[in-house]
Amino acid sequence: MRNKPRIRFKGFTEDWEQRKLSEVVTINPKTELPDKFKYVDLESVVGTNLLGFQVIKKENAPSRAQRLASYGDVFYQTVRPYQRNNYLFANIDKDMVFSTGYAQLRSKLYNYFLLTLVQNDNFVKVVLDNCTGTSYPAINGSELGKITVQIPSNDAEANQIGKVFRGIDNIITLHQRKLEKLKLAKKALLQKLFPKNGSQFPEIRFKGFTDAWEQRKLGDIATFSKGNGYSKSDLALSGNPIILYGRLYTNYETTISNVDTFVELKDKSVLSQGGEVIVPASGENAEDISRASVVKNQGIIIGGDLNVIKANHLLDPTFLALTISNGGQQKELSKRAQGKSVVHLHNSDLQEVNLIFPLLNEQKEISTLFEKMDNIITLHQRKLDRLQEVKIGLLQKMFV
């Protein structure tokens, strides 16, 4: 077994030590809870960020409220640990209490080194191997303490490593906040540039446009078809670009110009001509599938379980995708989606949607604005992805 990391700071050459986690941290130290405190449950930490807490009295607190935080404690998610929602408590509050869904790790090690250690792939893999349960795999504090870890024999090296990853995480958090602000700005503009509550006039408009918006059924001004075939198992490293329906939720904004998934072309594949608006035909809930994207380029395969809309001369495709995904049209789509564990949306449902739209020139102004915003959002997302890749690479090389 390798006992030295591949990348080290100058001056450190000693082998790393192999220790049980319980030998380097105190797990779930016993404390007395205050009469009133800020309670952090399992949904309150995402990644390494604390999203919020509840202020509650001790007598009203859930039985899981037991871990009173102290400066430097690391709270490790023991239920579904593959999510890696772990938090370093780095403030001086004396009244924050975490759920027993976290293991409380208190150590003399540099605390950011410890946080990074428990986020590492190697550690998470061993934890999962020792979990019980399938739907909600979990590990208790006793079993967690038995896990073997490798740490520097010199505390100064651990401190240096921790500082590197603290800096990287701070930069990642900054980019995440910028990205979230951009998405919120887009959402706010969508609410103001499209009419609400049955009105024919939006709250704000581009200069020179004053006419009322027109209302028509989507089926009167567009044609409809379906994508065809393909699943995740068909994906390849290269070949013909393809849009799979599941990636509409996570990988694409309103406009799709660049596609990073590929397959080998099959017979009867549906290829884009440019300007198709695609809407998921199924999903886990109505909100997921009540959204649309426009395929900008030709020659992209449109996979199965996608409804395909081709607008006529009255509609700009990007505008159509925007209006389907927001406001009254999105609410109408949500109501038409049918199903329980899986909901479905058919072209026949789309045809009945009441669409409200302005003249083509105003549509294009709106589309151009949001295409520019999407480009900026995509650019920031790529920067964030690259930073996360850098972090993963360093984790692999700076830990044993």
Locate each region found by the language model:
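Amphipathic alpha-helical segments with low aromatic content
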Residues: 1-17, 147, 154-214, 361-400
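A short glycine-rich beta-alpha junction/loop motif
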Residues: 2-3, 96-101, 132-157, 300-306, ...
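Non-catalytic DNA-recognition/assembly elements of restriction-modification systems
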Residues: 8-31, 205-227, 352
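Sequence-specific dsDNA recognition surfaces
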Residues: 22-29, 43-71, 219-231, 246-276
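Short, ligand-facing micro-motifs at secondary-structure edges
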Residues: 35-55, 71-98, 112-117, 125-129, ...
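Hydrophobic pocket-lining residues within nucleotide cofactor-binding pockets
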Residues: 45, 144, 194, 248, ...
